[in-house]
Amino acid sequence: STHCISSAASDVYKRQIYEMHHRDFSVDSTSGVKNKGKYLALTEHGTMNSDKLLTGIDHLIELGVTHVHLLPSFDYASVDETRLNENSYNWGYDPQNYNVPDGSYATDPYQPATRVKEFKQMVQALHKAGIRVIMDVVYNHTFNTDESNFERTVPGYFYRQKEDKTLANGSGCGNETASERLMMRKFMVESVLYWIKEYHVDGFRFDLMGIHDIETMNEIRKAVNAVDPTICIYGEGWAAEAPQYPADSLAMKGNIAQIPGVAVFSDELRDGLCGPVGDKRKGAFLAGIPGGEMSIKFGIAGAIEHPQVQCDSVNYTQKPWAKQPVQMISYVSCHDGLCLVDRLKASMPDITPEQLIRLDKLAQTVVFTSQGIPFIYAGEEIMRDKQGVDNSYKSPDAVNAIDWRRKTTNGDVFMYYKRLIDLRKSHPAFRMGDAGQVRKHLEFLPVEGSNLIAFRLKDHANGDHWEDIIVAFNSRPTPARLTIPVGKYTVVCKDGVIDVRGLGIQNGPEVIIPGQSALILYK
Protein backbone atom coordinates (compact mmCIF):
# COMPACT_ATOMS: atom_id res chain seq x y z
CA SER A 1 0.00 0.00 0.00
CA THR A 2 1.02 3.61 -0.42
CA HIS A 3 1.46 4.34 3.26
CA CYS A 4 2.49 1.11 4.96
CA ILE A 5 3.16 2.79 8.28
CA SER A 6 2.30 1.66 11.78
CA SER A 7 -0.85 3.27 13.12
CA ALA A 8 1.25 5.00 15.80
CA ALA A 9 2.86 7.33 13.30
CA SER A 10 -0.39 8.05 11.49
CA ASP A 11 -2.17 9.09 14.69
CA VAL A 12 -2.30 12.88 14.39
CA TYR A 13 -1.84 13.42 18.11
CA LYS A 14 1.29 11.27 18.35
CA ARG A 15 3.26 13.21 15.77
CA GLN A 16 6.76 14.29 16.76
CA ILE A 17 8.50 16.14 13.95
CA TYR A 18 12.25 16.32 13.22
CA GLU A 19 13.31 19.03 10.75
CA MET A 20 16.45 18.39 8.71
CA HIS A 21 18.48 19.52 5.71
CA HIS A 22 20.11 16.70 3.71
CA ARG A 23 23.61 18.17 3.90
CA ASP A 24 23.42 19.15 7.58
CA PHE A 25 22.44 15.65 8.55
CA SER A 26 25.11 13.55 6.89
CA VAL A 27 27.78 15.62 5.11
CA ASP A 28 30.21 15.78 8.03
CA SER A 29 33.06 13.27 8.08
CA THR A 30 31.95 12.23 11.59
CA SER A 31 28.62 10.87 10.27
CA GLY A 32 30.10 7.58 9.06
CA VAL A 33 27.70 7.82 6.11
CA LYS A 34 28.85 6.82 2.61
CA ASN A 35 26.42 8.92 0.54
CA LYS A 36 27.09 12.13 2.43
CA GLY A 37 24.50 14.88 1.93
CA LYS A 38 22.43 12.73 -0.44
CA TYR A 39 18.95 11.21 -0.44
CA LEU A 40 20.60 7.80 -0.11
CA ALA A 41 22.21 8.82 3.20
CA LEU A 42 18.82 8.13 4.78
CA THR A 43 18.84 4.55 3.45
CA GLU A 44 22.12 3.53 5.13
CA HIS A 45 21.78 1.44 8.28
CA GLY A 46 24.61 0.72 10.70
CA THR A 47 26.33 4.11 10.38
CA MET A 48 28.19 5.33 13.47
CA ASN A 49 30.46 8.04 14.77
CA SER A 50 34.01 7.15 15.84
CA ASP A 51 32.75 6.10 19.28
CA LYS A 52 30.35 3.55 17.79
CA LEU A 53 27.25 5.63 18.52
CA LEU A 54 24.50 5.48 15.90
CA THR A 55 24.15 8.20 13.26
CA GLY A 56 21.88 8.66 10.24
CA ILE A 57 18.59 6.79 9.97
CA ASP A 58 19.48 4.51 12.90
CA HIS A 59 19.92 7.61 15.06
CA LEU A 60 16.39 8.72 14.10
CA ILE A 61 14.99 5.30 15.01
CA GLU A 62 16.84 5.40 18.33
CA LEU A 63 15.59 8.92 19.08
CA GLY A 64 11.99 7.88 18.41
CA VAL A 65 10.66 10.73 16.24
CA THR A 66 7.65 9.84 14.06
CA HIS A 67 8.09 12.29 11.15
CA VAL A 68 11.07 13.73 9.31
CA HIS A 69 10.55 17.17 7.75
CA LEU A 70 12.95 17.60 4.84
CA LEU A 71 13.99 21.12 3.87
CA PRO A 72 13.28 21.85 0.16
CA SER A 73 13.98 18.72 -1.86
CA PHE A 74 12.19 19.69 -5.08
CA ASP A 75 14.36 21.17 -7.84
CA TYR A 76 15.64 24.54 -6.67
CA ALA A 77 17.78 27.13 -8.43
CA SER A 78 20.42 28.21 -5.93
CA VAL A 79 22.79 25.23 -6.16
CA ASP A 80 24.32 24.58 -9.59
CA GLU A 81 23.92 20.84 -10.25
CA THR A 82 26.76 20.92 -12.79
CA ARG A 83 29.28 22.18 -10.21
CA LEU A 84 28.65 20.00 -7.19
CA ASN A 85 32.39 19.64 -6.54
CA GLU A 86 32.28 23.21 -5.21
CA ASN A 87 30.19 22.01 -2.25
CA SER A 88 28.00 25.09 -2.37
CA TYR A 89 25.24 25.11 0.21
CA ASN A 90 21.69 26.42 0.22
CA TRP A 91 18.52 25.64 2.14
CA GLY A 92 16.67 25.57 -1.17
CA TYR A 93 13.83 28.07 -0.81
CA ASP A 94 14.36 29.04 -4.47
CA PRO A 95 11.82 27.07 -6.52
CA GLN A 96 12.67 26.21 -10.11
CA ASN A 97 10.73 23.02 -10.92
CA TYR A 98 8.15 22.05 -8.32
CA ASN A 99 7.44 18.49 -9.35
CA VAL A 100 10.84 16.85 -9.57
CA PRO A 101 13.45 16.10 -6.88
CA ASP A 102 16.51 18.33 -6.70
CA GLY A 103 19.58 16.89 -8.42
CA SER A 104 22.19 18.10 -5.95
CA TYR A 105 21.09 15.42 -3.47
CA ALA A 106 21.22 12.65 -6.10
CA THR A 107 24.37 10.64 -6.83
CA ASP A 108 24.17 11.62 -10.51
CA PRO A 109 22.34 14.83 -11.47
CA TYR A 110 22.90 14.15 -15.20
CA GLN A 111 20.74 11.00 -15.29
CA PRO A 112 17.10 12.08 -14.89
CA ALA A 113 15.96 8.74 -13.48
CA THR A 114 18.58 8.75 -10.71
CA ARG A 115 17.07 11.53 -8.60
CA VAL A 116 13.59 10.03 -8.96
CA LYS A 117 14.72 6.56 -7.94
CA GLU A 118 16.91 7.73 -5.05
CA PHE A 119 14.22 9.99 -3.61
CA LYS A 120 11.86 7.00 -3.67
CA GLN A 121 14.48 4.75 -2.06
CA MET A 122 14.84 7.31 0.73
CA VAL A 123 11.08 7.48 1.35
CA GLN A 124 10.86 3.70 1.30
CA ALA A 125 13.72 3.33 3.82
CA LEU A 126 12.14 5.84 6.20
CA HIS A 127 8.76 4.11 5.88
CA LYS A 128 10.35 0.74 6.66
CA ALA A 129 11.79 2.36 9.79
CA GLY A 130 8.27 3.50 10.78
CA ILE A 131 9.07 7.16 10.05
CA ARG A 132 6.86 9.33 7.85
CA VAL A 133 8.21 11.91 5.41
CA ILE A 134 7.20 15.59 5.26
CA MET A 135 8.19 17.82 2.35
CA ASP A 136 8.89 21.49 2.70
CA VAL A 137 6.96 23.16 -0.15
CA VAL A 138 7.48 26.71 -1.39
CA TYR A 139 4.56 27.57 -3.68
CA ASN A 140 4.54 31.19 -2.44
CA HIS A 141 7.22 32.48 -4.84
CA THR A 142 9.64 31.38 -7.55
CA PHE A 143 13.37 32.07 -7.81
CA ASN A 144 13.00 33.83 -11.17
CA THR A 145 10.00 35.78 -12.39
CA ASP A 146 10.48 36.67 -16.08
CA GLU A 147 12.29 33.40 -16.77
CA SER A 148 10.01 31.26 -14.61
CA ASN A 149 7.86 28.45 -15.98
CA PHE A 150 4.74 30.28 -14.76
CA GLU A 151 5.54 33.57 -16.50
CA ARG A 152 6.46 31.77 -19.71
CA THR A 153 3.16 29.87 -19.62
CA VAL A 154 0.80 32.84 -19.14
CA PRO A 155 2.59 36.16 -18.58
CA GLY A 156 1.20 38.15 -15.64
CA TYR A 157 -1.25 35.48 -14.52
CA PHE A 158 0.49 33.46 -11.79
CA TYR A 159 1.86 36.39 -9.77
CA ARG A 160 0.07 39.11 -7.83
CA GLN A 161 0.67 42.69 -8.94
CA LYS A 162 0.34 45.96 -7.07
CA GLU A 163 -1.95 48.74 -8.32
CA ASP A 164 0.92 50.21 -10.34
CA LYS A 165 1.42 46.83 -12.09
CA THR A 166 4.75 46.14 -10.38
CA LEU A 167 5.18 42.75 -8.74
CA ALA A 168 3.85 42.26 -5.22
CA ASN A 169 6.50 40.84 -2.91
CA GLY A 170 4.93 39.16 0.11
CA SER A 171 7.74 36.59 0.03
CA GLY A 172 10.51 39.16 0.31
CA CYS A 173 12.10 37.26 -2.60
CA GLY A 174 10.91 39.42 -5.50
CA ASN A 175 7.44 38.04 -6.21
CA GLU A 176 4.40 36.32 -4.69
CA THR A 177 2.19 33.77 -6.40
CA ALA A 178 -1.58 34.22 -6.77
CA SER A 179 -3.06 31.08 -5.20
CA GLU A 180 -6.58 32.55 -5.50
CA ARG A 181 -6.40 32.33 -9.31
CA LEU A 182 -7.93 29.09 -10.48
CA MET A 183 -5.00 27.73 -12.45
CA MET A 184 -2.47 28.51 -9.69
CA ARG A 185 -4.78 26.83 -7.18
CA LYS A 186 -5.16 23.84 -9.49
CA PHE A 187 -1.38 23.69 -9.89
CA MET A 188 -0.85 23.61 -6.11
CA VAL A 189 -3.50 20.95 -5.47
CA GLU A 190 -2.20 18.72 -8.26
CA SER A 191 1.44 19.19 -7.27
CA VAL A 192 0.73 18.09 -3.69
CA LEU A 193 -1.27 15.08 -4.92
CA TYR A 194 1.54 14.18 -7.32
CA TRP A 195 4.12 14.03 -4.51
CA ILE A 196 1.72 11.88 -2.48
CA LYS A 197 0.83 9.45 -5.25
CA GLU A 198 4.17 9.25 -7.07
CA TYR A 199 6.63 9.57 -4.17
CA HIS A 200 4.46 8.46 -1.21
CA VAL A 201 5.16 11.63 0.76
CA ASP A 202 3.21 11.81 4.05
CA GLY A 203 3.04 15.51 4.82
CA PHE A 204 3.70 19.07 3.71
CA ARG A 205 5.11 22.12 5.44
CA PHE A 206 4.04 25.26 3.59
CA ASP A 207 6.66 27.99 3.51
CA LEU A 208 5.17 31.46 4.17
CA MET A 209 1.68 29.94 4.08
CA GLY A 210 0.24 33.36 4.98
CA ILE A 211 0.73 34.35 1.32
CA HIS A 212 -1.77 31.71 0.20
CA ASP A 213 -5.51 32.25 0.47
CA ILE A 214 -7.72 30.34 2.92
CA GLU A 215 -9.83 28.75 0.19
CA THR A 216 -6.80 27.22 -1.54
CA MET A 217 -5.49 25.71 1.70
CA ASN A 218 -8.93 24.23 2.40
CA GLU A 219 -9.06 22.82 -1.14
CA ILE A 220 -5.63 21.22 -0.64
CA ARG A 221 -6.69 19.71 2.70
CA LYS A 222 -9.88 18.37 1.10
CA ALA A 223 -8.02 16.81 -1.84
CA VAL A 224 -5.44 15.25 0.48
CA ASN A 225 -8.14 13.86 2.80
CA ALA A 226 -9.64 12.01 -0.15
CA VAL A 227 -6.34 10.13 -0.51
CA ASP A 228 -5.20 9.83 3.12
CA PRO A 229 -6.54 11.98 5.98
CA THR A 230 -3.49 11.15 8.15
CA ILE A 231 -1.20 13.17 5.85
CA CYS A 232 -0.21 16.24 7.82
CA ILE A 233 -0.29 19.82 6.59
CA TYR A 234 1.22 22.73 8.48
CA GLY A 235 2.93 25.97 7.62
CA GLU A 236 4.22 29.34 8.61
CA GLY A 237 1.20 31.46 9.49
CA TRP A 238 2.86 34.65 8.31
CA ALA A 239 4.44 36.34 5.27
CA ALA A 240 7.73 38.24 4.84
CA GLU A 241 5.94 41.44 3.74
CA ALA A 242 2.22 42.25 3.49
CA PRO A 243 0.75 40.21 0.60
CA GLN A 244 -1.32 41.92 -2.11
CA TYR A 245 -4.57 40.27 -1.03
CA PRO A 246 -7.23 40.96 1.65
CA ALA A 247 -5.71 40.04 5.02
CA ASP A 248 -8.89 38.37 6.29
CA SER A 249 -8.77 35.90 3.36
CA LEU A 250 -5.16 34.77 3.86
CA ALA A 251 -3.95 31.57 5.56
CA MET A 252 -2.36 33.57 8.36
CA LYS A 253 -2.02 32.28 11.93
CA GLY A 254 -4.94 34.44 13.11
CA ASN A 255 -7.23 32.81 10.52
CA ILE A 256 -6.19 29.18 11.08
CA ALA A 257 -9.48 28.37 12.86
CA GLN A 258 -11.05 28.66 9.38
CA ILE A 259 -8.68 25.98 8.01
CA PRO A 260 -9.41 22.78 9.95
CA GLY A 261 -6.77 20.07 9.69
CA VAL A 262 -3.97 22.57 9.03
CA ALA A 263 -1.49 23.68 11.72
CA VAL A 264 0.82 26.67 12.18
CA PHE A 265 3.92 27.39 14.23
CA SER A 266 3.47 29.08 17.62
CA ASP A 267 5.96 31.93 17.80
CA GLU A 268 4.22 32.84 21.08
CA LEU A 269 5.60 29.75 22.82
CA ARG A 270 8.99 29.99 21.10
CA ASP A 271 9.62 33.62 22.04
CA GLY A 272 8.01 33.32 25.48
CA LEU A 273 10.76 30.81 26.17
CA CYS A 274 13.67 32.25 24.19
CA GLY A 275 12.99 35.97 23.78
CA PRO A 276 11.91 38.09 20.79
CA VAL A 277 13.06 36.71 17.46
CA GLY A 278 14.16 40.17 16.34
CA ASP A 279 16.60 40.72 19.21
CA LYS A 280 18.85 37.77 19.86
CA ARG A 281 20.48 39.35 22.90
CA LYS A 282 17.14 39.70 24.66
CA GLY A 283 16.09 36.63 26.60
CA ALA A 284 12.80 35.61 28.21
CA PHE A 285 11.68 32.75 30.50
CA LEU A 286 14.74 30.55 29.92
CA ALA A 287 17.04 33.48 30.73
CA GLY A 288 15.18 34.01 34.01
CA ILE A 289 13.47 37.17 32.76
CA PRO A 290 9.84 37.57 33.90
CA GLY A 291 6.95 38.30 31.54
CA GLY A 292 6.89 35.29 29.22
CA GLU A 293 4.86 33.04 31.49
CA MET A 294 1.41 33.63 29.95
CA SER A 295 2.78 33.21 26.40
CA ILE A 296 4.16 29.83 27.47
CA LYS A 297 0.84 28.84 29.09
CA PHE A 298 -0.86 29.81 25.81
CA GLY A 299 1.47 27.34 24.08
CA ILE A 300 1.11 24.59 26.69
CA ALA A 301 -2.68 24.64 26.15
CA GLY A 302 -2.21 24.43 22.36
CA ALA A 303 -3.20 28.01 21.36
CA ILE A 304 -6.85 27.26 22.15
CA GLU A 305 -9.25 29.08 24.41
CA HIS A 306 -8.57 28.07 28.02
CA PRO A 307 -10.11 29.74 31.09
CA GLN A 308 -6.70 30.20 32.74
CA VAL A 309 -4.92 31.68 29.71
CA GLN A 310 -5.32 35.46 29.64
CA CYS A 311 -4.55 36.41 26.06
CA ASP A 312 -4.04 40.09 26.86
CA SER A 313 -0.79 39.01 28.57
CA VAL A 314 0.40 36.91 25.61
CA ASN A 315 3.23 38.35 23.49
CA TYR A 316 1.87 38.20 19.93
CA THR A 317 -1.83 37.53 20.05
CA GLN A 318 -4.89 38.95 21.77
CA LYS A 319 -7.03 35.90 21.12
CA PRO A 320 -6.66 32.12 20.93
CA TRP A 321 -6.25 31.24 17.26
CA ALA A 322 -6.48 27.44 17.21
CA LYS A 323 -9.82 25.60 17.20
CA GLN A 324 -7.98 22.42 18.20
CA PRO A 325 -4.59 21.99 19.89
CA VAL A 326 -3.29 19.95 16.93
CA GLN A 327 -3.44 23.17 14.87
CA MET A 328 -0.41 24.40 16.82
CA ILE A 329 3.20 23.38 16.25
CA SER A 330 5.22 23.78 19.45
CA TYR A 331 8.92 24.48 19.08
CA VAL A 332 11.85 26.50 20.39
CA SER A 333 14.00 26.46 17.26
CA CYS A 334 14.03 25.56 13.59
CA HIS A 335 16.35 26.14 10.61
CA ASP A 336 15.42 29.85 10.67
CA GLY A 337 16.98 32.04 13.34
CA LEU A 338 19.38 30.80 15.98
CA CYS A 339 19.52 27.17 17.01
CA LEU A 340 18.73 26.63 20.69
CA VAL A 341 22.32 26.51 21.98
CA ASP A 342 23.23 29.71 20.11
CA ARG A 343 20.07 31.46 21.30
CA LEU A 344 20.80 30.62 24.94
CA LYS A 345 24.39 31.83 24.57
CA ALA A 346 23.32 35.07 22.84
CA SER A 347 20.72 35.96 25.47
CA MET A 348 22.89 34.84 28.43
CA PRO A 349 26.51 35.76 27.62
CA ASP A 350 27.77 34.45 30.99
CA ILE A 351 26.03 31.08 30.78
CA THR A 352 28.09 28.13 32.05
CA PRO A 353 28.25 24.78 30.19
CA GLU A 354 26.17 23.19 32.96
CA GLN A 355 23.47 25.88 32.78
CA LEU A 356 23.40 25.51 28.99
CA ILE A 357 22.57 21.82 29.33
CA ARG A 358 19.98 22.43 32.07
CA LEU A 359 18.16 25.15 30.12
CA ASP A 360 18.36 23.19 26.86
CA LYS A 361 16.59 20.27 28.53
CA LEU A 362 14.09 22.58 30.23
CA ALA A 363 13.17 24.24 26.92
CA GLN A 364 12.38 20.98 25.16
CA THR A 365 10.48 19.62 28.16
CA VAL A 366 8.06 22.52 27.71
CA VAL A 367 7.75 21.68 24.00
CA PHE A 368 7.12 17.96 24.51
CA THR A 369 4.62 18.34 27.37
CA SER A 370 2.56 20.93 25.45
CA GLN A 371 -0.72 19.99 23.78
CA GLY A 372 0.36 21.09 20.29
CA ILE A 373 2.48 19.01 17.90
CA PRO A 374 6.14 19.00 19.01
CA PHE A 375 8.81 19.88 16.49
CA ILE A 376 12.60 19.87 16.86
CA TYR A 377 15.43 21.03 14.66
CA ALA A 378 17.89 18.29 13.66
CA GLY A 379 20.93 18.11 15.90
CA GLU A 380 19.35 19.88 18.88
CA GLU A 381 19.28 16.49 20.61
CA ILE A 382 23.10 16.49 20.63
CA MET A 383 23.39 20.26 21.20
CA ARG A 384 24.42 21.34 17.72
CA ASP A 385 25.59 24.90 17.36
CA LYS A 386 25.87 27.09 14.28
CA GLN A 387 28.54 29.41 15.67
CA GLY A 388 25.96 32.11 16.31
CA VAL A 389 24.85 32.40 12.66
CA ASP A 390 21.15 33.27 12.67
CA ASN A 391 20.39 32.93 8.96
CA SER A 392 22.58 30.10 7.70
CA TYR A 393 20.71 29.63 4.40
CA LYS A 394 23.91 29.73 2.36
CA SER A 395 26.56 29.33 5.06
CA PRO A 396 29.16 26.62 4.45
CA ASP A 397 29.06 23.09 5.85
CA ALA A 398 31.45 24.29 8.57
CA VAL A 399 28.48 26.20 10.05
CA ASN A 400 25.56 23.96 9.10
CA ALA A 401 26.84 20.39 9.30
CA ILE A 402 25.99 18.36 12.39
CA ASP A 403 29.17 17.23 14.13
CA TRP A 404 28.34 13.69 15.24
CA ARG A 405 31.10 13.69 17.87
CA ARG A 406 28.59 15.73 19.87
CA LYS A 407 26.53 12.60 20.36
CA THR A 408 29.43 11.29 22.45
CA THR A 409 30.08 14.49 24.41
CA ASN A 410 26.36 15.19 24.91
CA GLY A 411 25.14 11.63 25.37
CA ASP A 412 23.25 12.65 28.49
CA VAL A 413 21.31 15.31 26.57
CA PHE A 414 20.50 12.82 23.80
CA MET A 415 19.19 10.34 26.37
CA TYR A 416 17.01 13.05 27.93
CA TYR A 417 15.47 13.94 24.53
CA LYS A 418 14.92 10.26 23.71
CA ARG A 419 13.16 9.65 27.03
CA LEU A 420 11.13 12.85 26.67
CA ILE A 421 9.91 11.69 23.25
CA ASP A 422 9.08 8.29 24.71
CA LEU A 423 7.24 9.86 27.67
CA ARG A 424 4.98 11.77 25.30
CA LYS A 425 4.44 8.72 23.10
CA SER A 426 3.48 6.53 26.05
CA HIS A 427 1.20 9.05 27.76
CA PRO A 428 -1.95 10.27 26.00
CA ALA A 429 -2.46 13.02 28.62
CA PHE A 430 0.24 15.09 26.88
CA ARG A 431 -1.53 14.87 23.51
CA MET A 432 -5.27 15.08 24.09
CA GLY A 433 -5.92 16.44 20.61
CA ASP A 434 -9.29 17.89 21.57
CA ALA A 435 -9.90 21.42 22.87
CA GLY A 436 -12.78 20.39 25.14
CA GLN A 437 -10.66 17.66 26.74
CA VAL A 438 -7.79 20.10 27.28
CA ARG A 439 -10.08 22.60 29.01
CA LYS A 440 -11.47 19.81 31.19
CA HIS A 441 -8.22 18.08 32.19
CA LEU A 442 -5.45 20.73 32.01
CA GLU A 443 -5.34 22.96 35.06
CA PHE A 444 -2.60 25.51 35.74
CA LEU A 445 -1.52 25.56 39.38
CA PRO A 446 -1.04 28.78 41.35
CA VAL A 447 2.62 29.71 41.89
CA GLU A 448 4.39 32.42 43.83
CA GLY A 449 6.58 34.82 41.88
CA SER A 450 7.77 34.70 38.29
CA ASN A 451 9.86 32.27 36.22
CA LEU A 452 7.84 29.35 37.53
CA ILE A 453 5.00 27.60 35.66
CA ALA A 454 3.10 24.55 36.86
CA PHE A 455 0.13 22.58 35.62
CA ARG A 456 -1.77 19.43 36.35
CA LEU A 457 -3.25 16.90 33.92
CA LYS A 458 -6.02 15.46 36.04
CA ASP A 459 -8.52 12.59 36.18
CA HIS A 460 -6.87 10.15 33.77
CA ALA A 461 -6.66 12.77 31.01
CA ASN A 462 -7.38 11.25 27.59
CA GLY A 463 -7.54 7.79 29.16
CA ASP A 464 -4.01 7.97 30.58
CA HIS A 465 -3.33 5.27 33.19
CA TRP A 466 -1.66 7.94 35.34
CA GLU A 467 -4.52 9.53 37.28
CA ASP A 468 -2.86 12.88 37.97
CA ILE A 469 0.28 14.30 36.40
CA ILE A 470 2.03 17.39 37.79
CA VAL A 471 4.44 19.26 35.49
CA ALA A 472 6.49 22.24 36.68
CA PHE A 473 9.08 24.44 34.97
CA ASN A 474 11.48 26.50 37.07
CA SER A 475 13.79 28.84 35.14
CA ARG A 476 15.17 30.54 38.24
CA PRO A 477 18.78 29.73 39.09
CA THR A 478 17.57 28.70 42.57
CA PRO A 479 15.11 26.00 43.75
CA ALA A 480 11.42 26.90 43.83
CA ARG A 481 8.62 25.71 46.09
CA LEU A 482 5.30 24.55 44.71
CA THR A 483 2.08 23.58 46.47
CA ILE A 484 0.36 20.58 44.87
CA PRO A 485 -2.76 18.57 45.76
CA VAL A 486 -2.04 16.18 48.65
CA GLY A 487 -1.10 12.66 47.64
CA LYS A 488 1.72 10.20 47.07
CA TYR A 489 3.46 10.88 43.75
CA THR A 490 6.12 9.05 41.75
CA VAL A 491 8.83 11.32 40.31
CA VAL A 492 9.59 10.66 36.61
CA CYS A 493 11.54 13.81 35.71
CA LYS A 494 13.77 15.78 38.06
CA ASP A 495 16.97 17.79 37.89
CA GLY A 496 17.68 16.95 34.24
CA VAL A 497 16.94 13.21 34.48
CA ILE A 498 13.92 11.34 33.09
CA ASP A 499 13.00 7.79 34.06
CA VAL A 500 9.41 6.59 33.72
CA ARG A 501 10.19 3.69 36.07
CA GLY A 502 10.44 6.31 38.81
CA LEU A 503 13.09 8.46 40.48
CA GLY A 504 11.61 8.20 43.96
CA ILE A 505 8.44 9.11 45.82
CA GLN A 506 7.29 12.61 46.68
CA ASN A 507 4.43 13.50 49.00
CA GLY A 508 2.37 16.68 48.67
CA PRO A 509 1.38 19.33 49.54
CA GLU A 510 4.80 20.93 49.01
CA VAL A 511 7.49 19.99 46.50
CA ILE A 512 10.81 21.59 45.58
CA ILE A 513 11.82 22.10 41.93
CA PRO A 514 15.59 22.49 41.46
CA GLY A 515 16.71 25.60 39.58
CA GLN A 516 16.68 25.70 35.76
CA SER A 517 14.86 22.39 35.41
CA ALA A 518 11.54 20.62 35.00
CA LEU A 519 9.77 18.39 37.50
CA ILE A 520 7.21 15.76 36.46
CA LEU A 521 5.32 13.63 38.99
CA TYR A 522 2.33 11.32 38.77
CA LYS A 523 -0.06 9.45 40.99
Say what each PLM segment does.
Residues T2-A9, Y13:
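Single conserved hydrophobic/aromatic residue that forms the stacking wall/gate
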Residues Q16-Y18, V68, V133-M135, F204, ...:
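Hydrophobic faces of well-ordered beta-strands that scaffold small-molecule active sites
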Residues R221-K222, A226-M383, V389, Y393, ...:
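Conserved alpha/beta catalytic core and glycan-binding cleft of carbohydrate-active enzymes
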Residues T408-Q437:
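Catalytic cores of secreted or luminal carbohydrate-active enzymes
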Residues S475-G487:
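Surface-exposed beta-strand/loop patches in extracellular or lumenal glycoproteins
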Residues P485-D499:
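Solvent-exposed beta-hairpin/edge-strand motifs
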Residues L503-K523:
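C-terminal beta-strand-rich structural cap/linker in extracellular carbohydrate-active enzymes
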